[in-house]
Amino acid sequence: MEFDPAKINTSSIDHVTILQYIDEPNDIRLTVCIIRNINNITYYINITKINTHLANQFRAWKKRIAGRDYMTNLSRDTGIQQSKLTETIRNCQKNRNIYGLYIHYNLVINVVIDWITDVIVQSILRGLVNWYIANNTYTPNTPNNTTTISELDIIKILDKYEDVYRVSKEKECGICYEVVYSKR
């Protein structure tokens, strides 16, 4: 069975994208929650929503030597601190649909996905994550708010604030009665 992007429903809650893959004829319902860290352009996937047992398996794997070594290497390769490769969102009234253990997508694709016994679900999960990453590349939508200041403008700004300083250097603070610009 092939991954079919037409069977994806997408929604979003509090910076978490919820992907639901529903294939009624084959009785497959898969929910994947993904957080995108814009600073690092990194994706974190909620393994608790995929299967509740995966979070416990992951925590146990992480304590073993193979898990520690893999996490250390991934941390070194990505430049992300080891403690930042996972994130937990606690269950509360507001987070009912998105709570769980979020882990770096590399861990999902290369480690956790092999723990899923159903090969069809593995294939669909791989396709779903790759589809999301391919279709949601980071493009900054904030304008570039930088201004170039010439040397002449810098001199004018310094002159203006030098005048303000000259006028205010003898003033006292209204609360503690100390000279505002006292040099210490």
UniProtKB/Swiss-Prot annotation:
Pfam families in alphabetical order: KilA-N (PF04383)
Signal peptide as annotated in the record: none
TM stretches of this protein: none
Domain KilA-N: 21-131
Keywords: Early protein
Note, other: Encodes a truncated version of the E3 ubiquitin ligase p28 protein present in variola virus. Lacks the C-terminal region containing the RING-type zinc-finger. The absence of RING-type zinc-finger in several attenuated vaccinia strains, demonstrates the importance of this domain in virulence.
Protein name: Truncated p28 protein
Source organism (scientific name): Vaccinia virus (strain Western Reserve) (VACV)
Taxonomic placement: Viruses, Varidnaviria, Bamfordvirae, Nucleocytoviricota, Pokkesviricetes
Gene designation per UniProt: p28
